[in-house]
């Protein structure tokens, strides 16, 4: 009678560890993209264009919520945020649902967020939808394309 070969427990444990890395490797890029998006929101809340700009790649394109003009260079993107922070004082962003898809060194985060700001002493809200396209640069996910538009009103 033949007995089946025994797998040493250390080898089995090693296999389990390697398998767990494989599954977390699939989750980690999505978490990193979500963190990059959250960092953008925190930078927006700071009201300083110089904190927002480094989150965009050098060749980024921005279709901002407040402008009909596409911004396709760093100076134009900076000008957009200088203007936005003046028009919407105390600007903050709160995220709703997000759908993150990762394709190697590129990723897309699509969802909605609500901007809040203070006007005439009263807090106002501006719901909007967005798409961020990211490219991985070293260990950082940088925005290469950003589209944001006000949420359309519902028709009844």
Regions found by a protein language model. Give the residues of each.
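Short, low-complexity N-terminal intrinsically disordered segments enriched in polar/charged residues
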Residues: 15-58, 154-156
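Solvent-exposed loop/turn segments at secondary-structure junctions
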Residues: 59-60, 67-69, 114-116, 149-153
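Short beta-strand edge/turn micro-motifs at domain boundaries
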Residues: 127-154
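A short, structured loop/turn motif at beta-sheet edges
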Residues: 100-107, 122, 134-140
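Bacterial N-terminal signal peptides that target proteins for export
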Residues: 1-12
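A solvent-exposed, acidic/Ser-Thr-rich amphipathic alpha-helical stretch
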Residues: 30-36, 49-105, 124-125
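Hydrophobic/aromatic beta-strand elements that line small-molecule binding cavities or substrate pockets
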Residues: 81, 95-100, 113-115, 129-135
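A short hydrophobic beta-strand element
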Residues: 105-115
